[in-house]
Regions:
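Helix-breaking motifs and short loop linkers at transmembrane-helix boundaries and internal kinks
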Residues: 64, 96, 117-122, 183, ...
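Helix-loop-helix hairpin linking two adjacent transmembrane segments in secondary transporters
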Residues: 152-153, 158-208
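Cytoplasmic helix-loop-helix junction between adjacent transmembrane helices
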Residues: 127-164
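A late C-terminal transmembrane helix in Major Facilitator Superfamily
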Residues: 347, 355-406
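Transmembrane alpha-helices of Major Facilitator/SLC transporters
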Residues: 282-306, 320
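C-terminal transmembrane helical hairpin of 12-TM major facilitator-type secondary transporters
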Residues: 308-352
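Symmetry-related core transmembrane helices of the 12-TM Major Facilitator Superfamily/SLC fold
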Residues: 187-204, 402-420
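Conserved MFS/SLC helix-loop-helix module at the cytosolic interface between two early adjacent transmembrane helices
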Residues: 82-121
Length: 428
């Protein structure tokens, strides 16, 4: 009996889902609507990630803390995000997408409750930490679930990427509008977000993903690798053959997301000074414009080669940072608005290029960990930027510090574009 249950049938399934082995039995891919539905949990969790942004002024007034403490609260989010990326990708590839996504959404709902009732800075930092953990799971398991259900269709990386940037843009404007128009702003904003996360839980429950662990048969038939065994908590990585693909993805994505962090950290205060208003919905609208730009660019660039997409990212990121530095020194509105649109385009193109390259080249049973590696590299740079900028601003003044950081991000983007141009054959 035992011998009849263990024939070497799984061997043909060792190839990535995007490139099935010849002769392997293939099931029909899920309907396209399932790919769209799978994007919603990613959108919902990224709405949470930025929903707090317009409300920091409310908390500062209620809890009485300064800019230095605010920097530490932001850092709690980055710590949670990076910590989740150390384990979420591996766990998702070994256990499946749902066992990672469901706890992430539940953590997001808990974070909403803490935000809504935060009695202290410590509680606020705890909510940001939980938000970071939930977001880290979203970029690992959530985005991998979208590409899994796409079954090799180009729609998968596109929707996974646009879901992230669209959610990140909706969060600030939703929170800004509700906080200006509804009573009890923090309770209202995070009550609505908790409902959105509950609907995302329902979507995850009905996702037509396999019950078994993704890639389990592939790992059983293939020789042991660093991705199929070893520690559950580790720096996310990709197979040796895909390291060059990860490097090219990071060359566009890391400077791009750093530029959006740079613009978001300075843009609202500059806009407030230029227009003479502190309306929270206006700051949220600025963030939405940035991420709508990212979404639009991703749909516009869904057909060109990945190399072209990454080069567009580099050019847009360099232009965005130089435009913001110009706005800081001239006090002009036009370069500030240009920096918003260009930064969104830089992140959107870099993220789409990186995700497309990894989903195409990395085996399916390492896909979530590959997504985690891409995002860990990008968020590590983008997360460190506002913290370092805050301390350098105290020492040198805001204009000098912002100029130095803007030029540094521009230099990184230019170097990344040069790498892509030189290694174009690896980014088809």
């Amino acid at each position: 009996m035992t011998e009849t249950r263990t024939p070497p049938v799984p061997a043909p399934r060792t190839a990535p889902a995007t490139r099935p082995a010849p002769g392997a039995p293939t099931a029909p891919p899920p309907p396209v609507r399932e790919v769209w539905f799978a994007t919603w949990p990613v959108v919902a969790l990224f709405i949470l990630s930025n929903a707090a942004m317009p409300l920091y002024g409310v908390w500062q007034h209620q809890l009485g803390f300064g800019s230095g403490t605010l920097t530490l609260v932001y850092a709690a989010y980055v710590v949670g995000l990076l910590g989740a990326l150390l384990v979420a990708g591996v766990a998702s590839d070994r256990l499946g997408r749902k066992p990672v996504l469901v706890p992430a959404l539940l953590l997001g709902i808990v974070a909403c409750l803490v935000y809504a009732t935060a009695p202290s800075v410590a509680a606020l930092a705890a909510a940001r930490l939980l938000t970071g953990i939930a977001t880290g799971a979203a970029v690992s398991a959530g985005m991998a679930a979208v590409t899994d259900l796409a079954a090799g269709r180009a729609l998968g990386p596109l929707l996974a990427s646009t879901g992230m940037v669209l959610g990140a843009g909706i969060g600030p404007v939703l929170a800004g509008v509700l906080s200006e128009t509804a009573p009890a702003p923090t309770v209202t904003v995070f009550g609505v977000e908790a409902v959105l996360l509950a609907t995302a839980l329902a979507v995850v429950a009905r996702m037509p993903l396999p019950r078994s662990r993704p890639g389990r048969d592939a790992r059983a038939a293939a020789p042991a690798t660093a991705g199929s065994s070893g520690s559950w908590v580790r720096l996310p990585a990709v197979p040796r053959a895909n390291r060059r693909h990860l490097a090219l993805g990071l060359a566009g994505f890391a400077p791009g997301i750093s530029a959006t962090a740079f613009v978001l950290s300075l843009g609202p205060s500059l806009l407030t000074g230029l227009l003479g208003t502190a309306n929270r919905a206006l700051a949220g609208g600025m963030a939405l414009a940035m991420f709508l730009s990212a979404t639009g660019v991703q749909f516009a660039l869904r057909r060109p080669a990945v190399r072209t997409v990454l080069l567009v990212s580099g050019a847009a990121t360099v232009s965005a940072t130089l435009a913001l530095v110009t706005a800081i020194h001239t006090g002009a509105l036009a370069p500030l608005l240009a920096s918003v649109v260009l930064a969104g385009a830089g992140q959107g193109a870099g993220q789409l290029g990186g995700l497309t390259l990894l989903s195409r080249e990395v085996p399916a049973h390492r896909r979530a960990e590959a997504n985690a590696a891409l995002n860990a590299g990008g968020y590590l740079l983008a997360g460190a930027l506002p913290v370092a900028d805050g301390y350098l601003s105290d020492a040198l003044g805001l204009p000098t510090a912002a100029t130095l950081f803007g030029l540094a991000v521009a230099a990184l983007a230019a170097a990344g574009a040069a790498l892509v141009a030189l290694r174009g054959k690896d980014a088809r």
